[in-house]
Amino acid sequence: VARPKTISDQRVLDAAHRVIGRVGPGFTLAQVAEEAQVSVGTVATRFGSKDRLVRAVFDNATAEVAVTMRTVAEAHADPVAALRAAAVGTFLSLGDASTAANHLGQLGHDLIDPVLRGKLATHFEVIRAELARAFDRAAGQLPGAPRAEVAVRVLLSLVNGVSIDWSVRPHGTLADRLGEDVDAVLGAWAARDEGGKG
């Protein structure tokens, strides 16, 4: 009879996320095991290899960002505030500047690996879909915005670019930086174009 699984996969995945934030792509399974307070054998048995663990961490992050963006958006009755919250909520899991830089280092590794690059594309598509969902609700209050497809692409490019720039040159918090830049775009879109739409 198989022994019950008392250590959840989520516990190991959360530990791996924290270790990557502290160490970057050079992390080891032993460091993850220590962080999760389990044996290296447990980590290896669950995930097989470091590469497979990273893929599982990526899948977990993709699922979590969708939940986070939708949850923070639904906390606002005002559609524009909800869109802002969704955009600002995209990369809050990066943490502070030092952990964000290490996650950025992991991103460089991800781009080399074709499987991880595919997972990154899926991650961005999930973010795009949540931004599109929020934008659809807010579009009526953003008369200066381009068509939905372009608007969502602009927001996705904005949050991706800000997160990378802030990771390299951190000033203040990431949430504040994202909020300021998202506000600049949404504020412009909220203003009616007197020469065109009006």
State each model region's role.
Residues I7, R11, A15-R52, A56:
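Helix-turn-helix
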Residues A15-R22, T68-A75, N102, Q106, ...:
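Solvent-exposed, amphipathic alpha-helical segments
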Residues G24, G48-R52, A56, E74-A77, ...:
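Residues in soluble alpha-helical coiled-coils and helical-bundle/repeat scaffolds
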Residues A56, R70-A100, A145-L155:
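Hydrophobic alpha-helical connector segments
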Residues D59-A66:
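Short, basic, alpha-helical segments at the C-terminal edge of helix-turn-helix-like DNA-binding modules
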Residues A81-A82, L94-G118:
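Amphipathic alpha-helical segments used for helix-helix packing
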Residues N102, V115, K119-R133:
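Short, solvent-exposed amphipathic helices
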Residues R117-A121, A138-G198:
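Hydrophobic/aromatic-rich alpha-helical bundle segments in the mid-to-C-terminal region
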